[in-house]
A protein has these predicted regions:
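Short internal beta-strands
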Residues: 68, 79-84, 116-120
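A glycine-rich helix N-cap at a beta->alpha junction
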Residues: 96-128
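A short aromatic-anchored loop/beta-hairpin motif
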Residues: 108-109, 126-147
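Short, glycine-rich nucleotide/cofactor-binding loops
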Residues: 45-62, 90-94
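Bacterial N-terminal signal peptides that target proteins for export
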Residues: 10-21
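Boundary at the C-terminal end of the N-terminal hydrophobic targeting segment
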Residues: 38-40
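C-terminal segment of classical bacterial N-terminal signal peptides
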Residues: 27-35
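Histidine-anchored nucleotide/phosphate-binding helix
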Residues: 59-74
Length: 162
C-alpha cells in the first residue's frame, strides 16, 4: 500500500510539472519569445568502410544504414559514404536484381532523400568501379582519388566511421 501511495504522488507531481511547463511555454510563445527546439538538427557523414566478407562487415553495414535512416528521420542532414571495402556494399545494394536482405533498407534511404557517394579510387581497388559507373552512380574523387573528408568537416559535418 505504501508503494502505491508513493507511485501516485510521483505521478501527480509529474502531471503538475508538465502542466506548469506547458503553460510557461505557451505564455512565451504568445509573447513572441522564440522557444528553441530540444535539439537542433545536426550534420553527419556516415562512412561505411567495412566489406561484405565477414559477420562484422554485415553488422557495420546494417548499422550504417540504420543510423543513416534514424538521423534522417529526426531531421538531421546525413550523407552516406561508401569507402574502402564498403564500395562492395554499394555495388550489391544497387544491383537491379539484388536479393540481399539489406537492399530494402538501402532503397528506403533513397526515398528519404539521403545523399550517397562512393569513393572512386576504392571502387576501382575493390573491383566494382565498372559496374557502379554503368549504373551512373556518384563516384567521387576529390582528394587523391577519394572523397574529401575535410570538405564535410569544413561544412560542419561530424564523421561516423564504420
Amino acid at each position: 500500500m505504501a508503494n502505491e501511495a508513493v507511485v501516485k504522488e510521483v505521478e501527480m507531481r509529474n502531471a503538475v510539472c508538465k502542466t506548469l511547463l506547458g503553460g510557461v511555454i505557451l505564455m512565451g510563445m504568445q509573447m513572441g519569445i522564440p522557444i528553441p527546439s530540444a535539439q537542433a538538427a545536426g550534420k553527419y557523414a556516415i562512412i561505411l568502410q567495412a566489406g561484405k566478407e565477414s559477420h562484422e562487415g554485415m553488422a557495420r553495414a546494417v548499422h550504417a544504414l540504420l543510423y543513416t535512416r534514424e538521423l534522417k528521420e529526426h531531421g538531421h542532414d546525413v550523407v552516406l559514404v561508401f569507402d574502402g571495402a564498403g564500395t562492395e556494399w554499394a555495388e550489391e545494394f544497387t544491383k537491379p536484381d539484388s536479393t540481399h536482405k539489406l537492399t530494402p533498407m538501402y532503397r528506403e534511404l533513397s526515398k528519404l532523400g539521403v545523399t550517397k557517394i562512393i569513393c572512386d579510387f576504392c571502387a576501382g581497388a575493390f573491383g566494382v568501379k565498372e559496374r557502379l559507373a554503368q549504373r551512373q552512380l556518384p563516384l567521387v574523387a576529390e582528394y587523391a582519388g577519394h572523397p574529401s573528408i575535410a570538405k564535410w568537416i569544413d561544412q560542419g559535418y561530424q564523421l561516423l566511421i564504420l
